[in-house]
């Protein structure tokens, strides 16, 4: 986040007791002791088995600082930065998958206009070198804040000007940030105390993600019709007023069935636009905003959002299938109407069809009749997350919302038939 453009990576290496301290001016005004630096980050990635995405400091850092960080992380031979890494205890370089050249440079990352940032991007990215041709670093350019389509247009225009066509503006991805604020930016609204009107308003705002992808994607198509540049939605999710008694800068919030629906709706949208959306990062993972995990000392609970992600994991590395669903419009206020259902479908490598659906209604179940073209149904397994809109997991009741089996599916001559309960997210595996 905004901390990236104040972070100086050399403050976070070497013995922890000698690392420089700084004030985290963006988040909480607390002292950052830099105990979690480059080595700790890559150790975490290795333990989790995940790809590494590092964000460089373009706002207040130098080109040399960014270049040396990439060298420190990825260069295997003899060089000042590689030697420093070895001195600090890591002989071999790490694999750096993605590198963001600045973060939110339209705002906290420097308050730049798009043309100025784009020229800075051109300069900085030049020195984000690929030291391993077989493991290239994907460069991520700072994209727009929500519906700032001018930013997207101007950044792409400037980065592509006097640039070889096959280099695609010297970028592999263009970021997009969008959060659901039910009541607006200043007073965002409670994570747990909301009514039917706010429920549908929140889901309506979650659905706006599709408009953003389509409109920014249309601009990207003008410069990149082959879709070589990925849309990187690397900050998304629900953002509420913090829980009472917590530091406003720590962004700690609870997580209810509303968040489960926001997650399911948004993931369905990402799936259906996976030709352009190449990465999407929920903000954030633990104890911040729409978390999948909340902790209290040594205790840990899984949120409704976690369980939705768990059901949707089957789409990963699968093949998107064209799908559509008949819907009706529901809601309380005319301005914030929503479709009653959303879906996405994929086929896994083993031939299994994975269907994910969301029922946005607070009071109505819907019978679903599916037509699976050229597919013989032999077996169906289902799992579901559902409950009353305010239901959540707490440290006293950690399993109030969880994944449950869903077996009420009937095979038909054309496909399958079932009823999806109100306020639910459903995953079906069809073989």
Annotated model-derived regions:
Residues 5-75, 117-138:
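Aromatic-lined substrate-binding rim segments of carbohydrate-active enzymes
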Residues 33-41, 76-91, 148-165, 265:
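Alpha-helical scaffolding within the catalytic cores
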Residues 45, 69, 99, 174, ...:
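Conserved, mostly hydrophobic/aromatic
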Residues 324-328, 333-338, 358-431:
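C-terminal beta-sandwich/jelly-roll accessory domains of carbohydrate-active enzymes
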Residues 114-264, 326-336:
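Noncatalytic carbohydrate-binding groove/subsite architecture in carbohydrate-active enzymes
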Residues 191, 228-343:
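Aromatic/acidic polysaccharide-binding cleft in carbohydrate-active enzymes
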Residues 2-38, 79-107, 182-197:
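Aromatic- and acidic-residue-enriched carbohydrate-binding clefts of CAZyme catalytic domains
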Residues 52-55, 97-101, 138-141, 173-176, ...:
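Structural recognition of the beta-strand scaffold that forms the well-ordered cores
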């Amino acid at each position: 986040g905004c901390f990236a453009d104040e972070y100086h990576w050399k403050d976070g290496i070497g013995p922890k007791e000698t690392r420089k301290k700084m004030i985290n001016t963006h988040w909480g005004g607390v002292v950052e002791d830099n105990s979690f630096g480059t080595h700790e980050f890559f150790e975490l990635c290795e333990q989790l088995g995940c790809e590494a995405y590092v964000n460089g400091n373009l706002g207040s850092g130098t080109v040399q600082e960014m270049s040396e960080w990439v060298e420190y992380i990825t260069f295997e031979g003899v060089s000042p930065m590689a030697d420093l890494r070895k001195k600090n205890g890591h002989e071999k370089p790490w694999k750096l998958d993605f590198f963001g050249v600045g973060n939110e440079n339209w705002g906290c990352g420097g308050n730049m206009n798009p043309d100025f940032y784009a020229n800075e991007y051109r300069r900085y990215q030049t020195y984000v070198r690929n030291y391993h041709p077989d493991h290239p670093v994907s460069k991520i350019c700072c994209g727009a804040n929500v519906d700032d389509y001018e930013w997207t247009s101007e950044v792409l225009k400037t980065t592509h000007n006097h640039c070889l066509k096959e280099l695609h503006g010297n970028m592999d991805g263009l970021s997009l940030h969008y959060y659901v604020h039910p009541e607006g930016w200043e007073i965002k609204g409670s994570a747990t105390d909301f009514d039917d009107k706010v429920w549908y308003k929140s889901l309506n705002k979650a659905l706006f993600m599709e408009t953003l992808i389509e409109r920014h994607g249309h601009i990207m198509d003008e410069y990149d019709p082959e879709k070589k540049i990925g849309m990187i939605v690397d900050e998304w999710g629900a953002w509420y007023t913090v829980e009472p008694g917590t530091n406003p800068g720590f962004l700690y919030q609870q997580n209810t069935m509303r968040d489960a629906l926001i997650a399911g709706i948004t993931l369905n949208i990402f799936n259906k636009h996976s030709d352009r959306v190449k990465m999407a990062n929920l903000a954030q993972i633990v104890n911040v905003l729409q978390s999948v995990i909340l902790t209290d000392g040594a205790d840990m609970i899984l949120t409704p959002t976690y369980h939705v992600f768990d059901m949707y994991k089957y789409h990963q590395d699968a093949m998107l299938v064209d799908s559509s669903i008949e819907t009706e419009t529901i809601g309380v206020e005319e301005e914030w109407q929503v479709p009653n259902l959303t879906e996405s479908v994929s086929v896994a490598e083993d031939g299994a069809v994975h269907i994910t659906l969301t029922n946005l209604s607070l009071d109505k179940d819907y019978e679903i009749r599916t037509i699976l073209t050229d597919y013989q149904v032999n077996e169906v397994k289902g799992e579901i997350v559902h409950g009353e809109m305010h239901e959540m997991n707490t440290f006293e009741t950690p399993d109030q919302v969880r994944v449950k089996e869903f077996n009420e599916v009937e095979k038909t001559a054309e496909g399958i038939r079932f009823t999806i309960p109100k306020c639910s997210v459903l995953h079906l595996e069809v073989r």
